Design a protein with these regions (language model features):
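Glycine/proline-rich, flexible active-site/cofactor-binding loop segments
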Residues: 115-131
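Short, solvent-exposed loop/turn segments at secondary-structure junctions
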Residues: 16-18, 23-24, 123-126, 156-158, ...
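Glycine-rich phosphate-binding "P-loop"
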Residues: 85-96, 126-136
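Asp-based, Mg2+/Mn2+-dependent phosphohydrolase catalytic module
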Residues: 1-4, 128-151, 155-198
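Short hydrophobic segments within beta-strands
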Residues: 10-13, 18, 119, 152, ...
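A metal-dependent, Asp-based hydrolase signature
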Residues: 40-92
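Active-site neighborhood of HAD-like aspartate-dependent phosphohydrolases
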Residues: 1-59, 63
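Short, acidic loop-to-helix structural element flanking the phosphoryl-transfer center
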Residues: 86-117
Length: 198
């Protein structure tokens, strides 16, 4: 194995290491299969999220569940606690399987000489106790303290604004806002393309 000398931080486990939108859509579609209005609103929220303008947080996820619970009405009402419990269970099951299929990426990055950490502010992910995942409620503070050489993320607000002096930024997705603010940024479609740019 090559000497690990390049410091890489993967700033968002959910949106960079795997396709969180795909997982979230599957869970929400299952929970709210009898609520087309909620599914329509959810698609709009995901479009806004894809622009990288809004940061992601557990607080935001919980607020989303509260609103969806209210919108579920009376006839097919779903309580907040039921939504939360079902979401957590399905998330952990789906994500654990996806993560196990991508362990080779960690080894590949190590072999290319990168020391790295994977950040998450998602308590569900943290409770899976997976390799090299660090749980933090304040990613911004962590990134400022670590100040990595390379930063891989998906959201300007959550990730890049906290590390203005990185040698290179890699964005998973379109990164519209990120491209407006950063010069040394490369966009990739998914994590499978990371080896083309690192």
């Amino acid at each position: 194995m090559k000497t690990a000398v390049k410091n890489l931080v993967i700033s968002d486990f959910d949106m960079t290491f795997f396709n969180f939108k795909e997982v979230d859509n599957k869970i929400i579609a299952t929970i709210f299969e009898k609520h087309p209005l909620i599914l329509f609103i959810d698609n709009i929220l995901w479009y806004v999220n894809s622009l990288g303008i809004i940061g992601n947080s557990m607080g935001g996820l919980k607020l989303r569940f509260i609103v969806y619970s209210i919108l579920s009405g009376f006839r097919n009402h779903i309580s907040y606690s039921e939504i939360f419990t079902n979401y957590e269970s399905m998330y952990k099951n789906l994500v654990y399987k996806k993560y196990k299929r991508k362990i080779w990426m960690i080894k590949g990055l190590e072999n290319k000489g990168y020391t790295f950490r994977i950040l998450t502010n998602n308590r569900f992910a943290a409770e899976l106790n997976m390799y090299d995942i660090i749980y933090t409620k304040n990613k911004g503070k962590f990134l400022k303290e670590v100040n990595p050489e390379y930063l891989l993320g998906d959201n300007y607000w959550d990730d890049y604004r906290n590390c203005p002096k990185c040698t290179k930024y890699i964005n998973v997705g379109n990164g519209i806002l990120s491209k407006l603010h950063l010069k040394n940024i490369t966009c990739i479609k998914n994590m499978y393309e990371v080896f083309k740019v690192l």
